[in-house]
């Protein structure tokens, strides 16, 4: 039985149309473009020197590594990966080797120019990433290379630009020239614009008398500027401290965190006046709060005037010892009793807060001196209830004469005050002994020069103590000799 004949299937040309239709169908699968056109494609290969891009052309396009990014000397693998969809500009349809040469960065450049020009027209900011530090400034990737001069990076000149690498920042476009491929940016202009808006809103919400925290941003001869959070206010040198200072650096340094009070907000001039000392207790009020009339305090003679001597009793606090309060005897001039720089225990006889004056007495302090230590005279005033009973310190058990557990802080504070009062009594004792010795020496000299000297002349040596006190002190000195 003969085998069946196998015949190949026949396909008529008419099944796919005419030959013209066939060529047209093939033609539709091939993209046609010219130099300078922007095409889209898929990354199919990434090499060290180049990247291959499938754009549906008869051959794959080649993007040289230098045409991948506006950054210099980049690794292609850091820019693209296989499978990425990208745009590229046709540089050459066919080079000497017959390759289609493309540029990714040029495509970005062309697209970016349109965006940049539109932003410039609207006076809007552009956002980009800092990719390089060059001579004179920074290079930003804004789709093309934008130059940001160092003088326009911040409100103040920045010396070290390296920390900006990799940061995304906004800037205004101040110069644009496509023919020269020149784009100049200014972050300072953007900061001025945005900060002006923020400043206006901030100032509207800033009320006189409010307490704010800030950071010292700069120091000048006439004061210190404090950043309150985007807005700087001035603390005039007279508002930095209750005491006299010659320069702001005596009180604050750049970077210091401070608490200030708002003294004034000038909306028209957009200026804020601040005070540092207003947030601190007035030393005069502090002195008045912690000292009582009649208390004996240590001080140092700072100045002599015809009518008395000024004595500093605390930092920034000076009181006057009137010439009549220097000694029991008549004093012609203050330097007969004290000299500038002398330590002196003086008695507080008046505090005038309104006039900021303190009256002191050296004479009364010495009259009140007793060898027996009385803490109340030196700052530890006794407290009594309405029935006249002594009020013991908090945490002290009067029955056992012991401090209770849990009151260690109160005990430490009380003992510190007691120790300070005791120290002052010792200073007072030393002062009395010193002048007793001086009086004794002065009287001995007078006895040798004139046996008939008048009593007033016998005291010409400058005693600071009464006769009774001097007698008691002479006995003490004689007993310890």
Curated annotation (Swiss-Prot):
Gene3D superfamilies: Nucleic acid-binding proteins (2.40.50.140). One of its GO terms (molecular function) is structural constituent of ribosome. Mutations in this gene that alter POA binding may cause antibiotic resistance. It comes from Mycobacterium tuberculosis (strain ATCC 25618 / H37Rv). Keywords: Repeat, Ribonucleoprotein, Ribosomal protein, RNA-binding. GO terms for biological process: translation. GO terms for cellular component: cytosol; cytosolic small ribosomal subunit; peptidoglycan-based cell wall; plasma membrane. SMART domains: S1 (SM00316). InterPro entries: NA-bd_OB-fold (IPR012340), Ribos_protein_bS1-like (IPR050437), Ribosomal_protein_S1-like (IPR035104), S1_domain (IPR003029). Full-length S1 protein and the C-terminal domain (residues 285-481) bind tmRNA; the interaction is disrupted in a concentration-dependent manner by POA. 2 POA molecules bind to the C-terminal domain (residues 285-481) and S1 motif 4 (residues 285-368). Binds mRNA, facilitating recognition of most mRNAs by the 30S ribosomal subunit during translation initiation. Probably plays a role in trans-translation; binds tmRNA (the product of the ssrA gene). In trans-translation Ala-aminoacylated transfer-messenger RNA (tmRNA, product of the ssrA gene; the 2 termini fold to resemble tRNA(Ala) while it encodes a short internal open reading frame (the tag peptide)) acts like a tRNA, entering the A-site of the ribosome and displacing the stalled mRNA (which is subsequently degraded). Residues 36-105, 123-188, 209-277, 294-363 form the S1 motif domain. The keyword Ribosomal protein applies. Belongs to the bacterial ribosomal protein bS1 family. Residues 437-456 have a biased composition (Low complexity). This is Small ribosomal subunit protein bS1. Residues 429-467 are annotated as: Disordered. It comes from the Bacteria.
């Amino acid at each position: 039985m003969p085998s069946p004949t196998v015949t190949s299937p026949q396909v008529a040309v008419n099944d796919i149309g005419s030959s013209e239709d066939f060529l047209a169908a093939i033609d539709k699968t091939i993209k046609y473009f010219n130099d300078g056109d922007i095409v889209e494609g898929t990354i199919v290969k990434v090499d060290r020197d180049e990247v291959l891009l499938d754009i549906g052309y008869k051959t794959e396009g080649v993007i040289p590594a230098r045409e991948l990014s506006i950054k210099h000397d980049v690794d292609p693998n850091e820019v693209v990966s296989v499978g990425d969809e990208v745009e590229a500009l046709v540089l050459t349809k066919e080079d000497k080797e017959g390759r289609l040469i493309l540029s990714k960065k040029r495509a970005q450049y062309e697209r970016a120019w349109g965006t940049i020009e539109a932003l410039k027209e609207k006076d809007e900011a552009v956002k980009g990433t800092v990719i390089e530090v060059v001579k004179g400034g920074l290079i930003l990737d804004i789709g093309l290379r934008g130059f940001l001069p160092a003088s326009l990076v911040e409100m103040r000149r920045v010396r070290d630009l390296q920390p900006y690498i990799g940061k995304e920042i906004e800037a205004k476009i101040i110069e644009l020239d496509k023919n020269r491929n020149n784009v100049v940016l200014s972050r300072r202009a953007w900061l001025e614009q945005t900060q002006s808006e923020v400043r206006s809103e901030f100032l509207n919400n800033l009320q006189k008398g409010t307490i704010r925290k800030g950071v010292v941003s700069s120091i000048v001869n006439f004061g210190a500027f404090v950043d309150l959070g985007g807005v700087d206010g001035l603390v005039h040198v007279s508002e930095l401290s209750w005491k006299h200072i010659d320069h702001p650096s005596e009180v604050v340094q750049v970077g210091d965190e401070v608490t200030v009070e708002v003294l004034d907000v000038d909306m028209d001039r957009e200026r804020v006046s601040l005070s540092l000392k207003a947030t601190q207790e007035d030393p005069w009020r502090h002195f008045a709060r912690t000292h009582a009339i009649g208390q004996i305090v240590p001080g140092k003679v700072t100045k002599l005037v015809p009518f008395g001597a000024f004595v500093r009793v605390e930092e920034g606090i000076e009181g006057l010892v009137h010439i009549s309060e220097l000694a029991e005897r008549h004093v012609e001039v203050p330097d007969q009793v004290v000299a500038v720089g002398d330590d002196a225990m003086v008695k507080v006889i008046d505090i005038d807060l309104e006039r900021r004056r303190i009256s002191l007495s050296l004479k009364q302090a010495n009259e009140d001196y007793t060898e027996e230590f009385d803490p109340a005279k030196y700052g530890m005033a006794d407290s009594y209830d309405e029935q006249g009973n002594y009020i013991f310190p908090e945490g002290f058990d009067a029955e056992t004469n012991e401090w209770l557990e849990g009151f260690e802080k109160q005990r430490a504070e009380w003992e510190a005050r007691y120790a300070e009062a005791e120290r002052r009594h010792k200073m007072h004792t030393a002062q009395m002994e010193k002048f007793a010795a001086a009086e004794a020496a002065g009287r001995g000299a007078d006895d040798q020069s004139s046996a008939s000297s008048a009593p007033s002349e016998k005291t010409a040596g400058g005693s600071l103590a009464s006769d009774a006190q001097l007698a008691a002190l002479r006995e003490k000195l004689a007993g310890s000799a």
